[in-house]
């Protein structure tokens, strides 16, 4: 603001000071004394002696311009130093006429914008790192310090424990894995190691024991599960091998689910013998039977036992399939039943078996009708199932 100089003895000065002829003498705002000088300085409606209007910081007399904050007045430089923008490095105010440097939101003097390590002033285009406390580090010094820190961390000093010291610590650990403070102090005095070294050694030892126990339990259970997996794998491979062998044997037999007549010969007790001298009902030995054999005739007992699982000839699955055999001759007409409790009654002429009945003494009876080739609803599909319906208790 501009200072206003007023003369006290003229009407003009009275008008400038705002007086209307009042005999009241103004009082100085600096020394609180009445102003009887020829000239009076006026700042914000306050009157000053010429010698009392000074800068609050540098005490220089203010003649033309001054800056006020509260009850204090300042010169231009001191006002901006105190209340203006401050440098982030030196924390001093920056006058508005000076050239500054900026880094993000921080403002620096030109001479303060320098590396804190090498003290080199940074110019436009230089690369630098801005630290958290607003300090500046040039790129070369930053990378050097970082590399030095990494090397010091990698080459930290290691404590060497002798064999005697180690033996003492092991004995103490066997007595108490977690010793009290006075025990650690005693061990420190005995071994000559630092208290911190003794404490860290016990901590590492306890962690190692815990890790070894955990690893041992994991290995035990791992071996157990591996054995279980191996045993399951072996059993599964056995089942797979059985299943793989099954289709090979099934491919060689026409009817796989039914027992062969040779097996029924001795197990069921119904067909006890089969020979050439057995009585034949309704046919001769020279005629073609149910089996289309190359030499012709009825199969003998030795030939019949050769009908095994690897034979291309199979046993008919149901009585309905007998109608499709050559000559439509019943298979049961070629078999002899020496047991007295079971008989076969055939009706019809030679080579023709229109109807037959299997009669058991005390067992159930069923009719076989050859009137059609569509099948027999009274009997199930398997010959073993309907042959087993005969009561075996009487035999």
From Swiss-Prot:
- Tissue expression notes: In dorsal regions at neural tube and tailbud stages and in adults predominantly in the pituitary gland and weakly in the eye and brain.
Primary location group: nucleus
The record's subcellular location field reads: Nucleus
- Residue numbers of the DNA-binding region are 154-213
Alphabetical list of SMART domains matching this protein: HOX, LIM
Positions the record marks as coiled coil are none
Q: Which GO terms describe its biological process?
A: neuron differentiation; regulation of transcription by RNA polymerase II
Query: InterPro entries, per this entry?
Result: HD (IPR001356), Homeobox_CS (IPR017970), Homeodomain-like_sf (IPR009057), Lhx3/4-like_LIM2 (IPR049594), Lhx3_LIM1 (IPR049593), LIM_Homeobox_TF (IPR050453), Znf_LIM (IPR001781)
Q: Which UniProt keywords apply?
A: Activator, DNA-binding, Homeobox, LIM domain, Metal-binding, Nucleus, Repeat, Transcription, Transcription regulation, Zinc
The segment(s) forming the LIM zinc-binding domain are 28-78, 87-141
Q: Which GO terms describe its molecular function?
A: DNA-binding transcription factor activity, RNA polymerase II-specific; RNA polymerase II transcription regulatory region sequence-specific DNA binding; transcription coregulator binding; zinc ion binding
User: What PROSITE patterns has UniProt attached to this entry?
Assistant: HOMEOBOX_1, HOMEOBOX_2, LIM_DOMAIN_1, LIM_DOMAIN_2
Q: Where is this region: Disordered?
A: 208-304, 363-383
Nucleus in keyword set: yes
> What is its quaternary makeup?
Interacts with ldb1 and with the N-terminus of rnf12.
Check the record and name the PANTHER family matching this protein: LIM/HOMEOBOX PROTEIN LHX (PTHR24208), LIM_HOMEOBOX PROTEIN LHX3 (PTHR24208:SF91)
What the protein does comes down to: Transcription factor. May be involved in the specification and maintenance of differentiation of distinct neuronal and neuroendocrine tissues. Early marker for the pituitary and pineal lineages, it may be involved in specifying these lineages.
Name of protein: LIM/homeobox protein Lhx3
Q: Which organism is it from?
A: Xenopus laevis (African clawed frog)
């Amino acid at each position: 603001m501009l200072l206003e100089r007023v003369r006290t003895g003229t009407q003009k000065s009275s008008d400038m000071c705002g007086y209307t002829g009042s005999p009241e003498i103004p009082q100085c705002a600096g020394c609180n004394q009445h102003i009887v000088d020829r000239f009076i300085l006026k700042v914000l409606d306050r009157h000053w002696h010429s010698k009392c209007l000074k800068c609050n910081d540098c005490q220089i007399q203010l003649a033309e311009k001054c800056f006020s904050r509260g009850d204090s007045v300042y010169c231009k430089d001191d006002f901006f130093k105190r209340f203006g923008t401050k440098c982030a490095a030196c924390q001093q105010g920056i006058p508005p006429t000076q050239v500054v440097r900026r880094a993000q939101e921080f403002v620096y003097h030109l001479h303060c914008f320098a590396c804190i390590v090498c003290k080199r002033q940074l110019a436009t285009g230089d690369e630098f790192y801005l630290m958290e406390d607003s300090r500046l580090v040039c790129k070369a010094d930053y990378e050097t310090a970082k590399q030095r820190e990494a090397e010091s961390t990698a080459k930290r000093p290691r404590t060497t424990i002798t064999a005697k010291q180690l033996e003492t610590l092991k004995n103490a650990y066997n007595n108490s894995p977690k010793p009290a403070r006075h025990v650690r102090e005693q061990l420190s005095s005995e071994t000559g190691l630092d208290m911190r070294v003794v404490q860290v050694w016990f901590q590492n030892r306890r962690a190692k024991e815990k890790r070894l126990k955990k690893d041992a339990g994991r290995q035990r259970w791992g071996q157990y599960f591996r054995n279980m997996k191996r045993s399951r794998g072996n059993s599964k491979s056995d089942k797979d091998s059985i299943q793989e062998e099954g289709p090979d044997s099934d491919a060689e037999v026409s009817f796989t689910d039914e027992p062969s007549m040779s097996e029924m010969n001795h197990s069921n007790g119904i067909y006890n013998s089969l020979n050439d001298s057995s009585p034949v009902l309704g046919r001769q030995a020279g005629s073609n039977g149910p089996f289309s054999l190359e030499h012709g005739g009825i199969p003998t007992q030795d030939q019949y036992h050769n009908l095994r699982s690897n034979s291309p000839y199979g046993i008919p699955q149901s009585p309905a399939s007998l109608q499709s055999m050559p000559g439509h001759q019943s298979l049961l007409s070629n078999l002899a039943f020496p047991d007295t409790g079971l008989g076969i009654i055939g009706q019809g002429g030679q080579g023709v078996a229109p109807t037959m009945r299997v009669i058991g003494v005390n067992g159930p009876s069923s009719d076989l009708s050859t009137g059609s080739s569509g099948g027999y609803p009274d009997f199930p599909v398997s010959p073993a199932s309907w042959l087993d319906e005969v009561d075996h208790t009487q035999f």
